[in-house]
């Protein structure tokens, strides 16, 4: 059943308000129209593209800010953050992040997203990775979106904060990392 333009735009606006991280491609499939139609509808409704929506949500929904590094230095777009507890970031695998001959993402980009998220979740001015245990579980390809989720698990016997990061493409695990984080409050005997 084909919807009228007004009806489609109304439903589109509602959908984006409910799920601001939905892509134009996903919307096109859901509404059975072209990606270009979705983009034109968004322009008419003054709805920004995905990257701008992510930045808007990130800056407006946090009560806390990243302390250990500037937000623009976090690899990927941070979409959720609760210092010393959890954080989530997303990273779209673009052509500049892949090997040219096989379109597979370079592993250091997947690691960098996870590592910078582990740093960002620490509630301290200085946070450094002292040690990490990593496992890549499948290759990530150009065009895929990696969602990294960091959870602070506690402290080790050397008073380093342990951060576990799991990265997914859709619901499939592609990377896990356990990061042992040194931070300046370790020196002062705080936290």
Swiss-Prot record:
Keywords: DNA-binding, Fatty acid biosynthesis, Fatty acid metabolism, Lipid biosynthesis, Lipid metabolism, Repressor, Transcription, Transcription regulation. GO terms for biological process: fatty acid biosynthetic process; negative regulation of DNA-templated transcription; negative regulation of fatty acid biosynthetic process. It comes from the Bacteria. Disulfide bonds: none annotated. GO terms for molecular function: DNA binding; DNA-binding transcription factor activity. Belongs to the FapR family. Transcriptional factor involved in regulation of membrane lipid biosynthesis by repressing genes involved in fatty acid and phospholipid metabolism. This is Transcription factor FapR. It comes from Oceanobacillus iheyensis (strain DSM 14371 / CIP 107618 / JCM 11309 / KCTC 3954 / HTE831). The gene is fapR.
């Amino acid at each position: 059943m084909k919807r009228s333009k007004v009806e489609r735009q109304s439903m589109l606006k509602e959908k984006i308000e409910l799920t601001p991280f939905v892509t134009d491609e996903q919307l096109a499939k859901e509404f059975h129209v072209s990606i270009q139609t979705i983009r034109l509808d968004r322009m008419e409704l003054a709805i920004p593209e995905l990257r701008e929506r992510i930045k808007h949500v990130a800056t407006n929904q946090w009560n806390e800010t990243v302390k250990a590094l500037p937000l623009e230095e976090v690899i990927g777009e941070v979409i959720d953050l609760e210092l010393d507890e959890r954080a989530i970031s997303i990273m779209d695998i673009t052509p500049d992040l892949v090997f040219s001959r096989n379109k597979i993402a370079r592993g250091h980009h997947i690691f960098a997203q996870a590592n910078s998220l582990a740093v960002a979740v620490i509630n301290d001015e200085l946070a450094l990775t002292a040690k990490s245990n990593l496992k890549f579980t499948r290759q990530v390809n150009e065009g895929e979106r990696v969602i990294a989720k960091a959870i602070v698990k506690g402290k080790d016997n050397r008073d380093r904060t342990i951060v576990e990061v799991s990265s997914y493409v859709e619901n499939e695990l592609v990377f896990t990392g356990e990061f042992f984080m040194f931070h300046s409050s370790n020196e002062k005997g705080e936290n």
